[in-house]
Amino acid sequence: MNNWQEELFLKIIKREEPATILYEDDKVIAFLDKYAHTKGHFLVVPKNYSRNLFSISDEDLSYLIVKAREFALQEIKKLGATGFKLLINNEPDAEQSIFHTHVHIIPYYKK
């Protein structure tokens, strides 16, 4: 991994890297995933840096999950999705590639 990957989300938060931002408040930011698995796949990222679930504070984790659910329910309704997956990868063996805690919200649609 290089510094670009490590700092990508911080750059998005600071508007130094382009992203389609869907939601932002003082604690989290949500934006479309550049490598989406499905239409509308987005990420919710805490602004306070932590590597993953092993290091995030309980307070930041609670806020992140509540906001991820709240925003997921809102977005899947807009998209016409019939369900969604909430995913958090932790460490390389679990396919974490950007080492800043984040939640994937992946909408699913009727087949």
UniProtKB/Swiss-Prot annotation:
Organism: Mesomycoplasma hyorhinis
One Pfam family in the UniProt entry: HIT
Boundaries of every HIT domain copy: 8-111
Short sequence motif Histidine triad motif: positions: 100-104
Record-given protein name: Uncharacterized 13.1 kDa HIT-like protein in P37 5'region
NCBIfam families attached to this UniProt entry: M_plasma_HinT
Entry's Gene Ontology BP terms: nucleotide metabolic process
Gene Ontology MF terms in the entry: catalytic activity
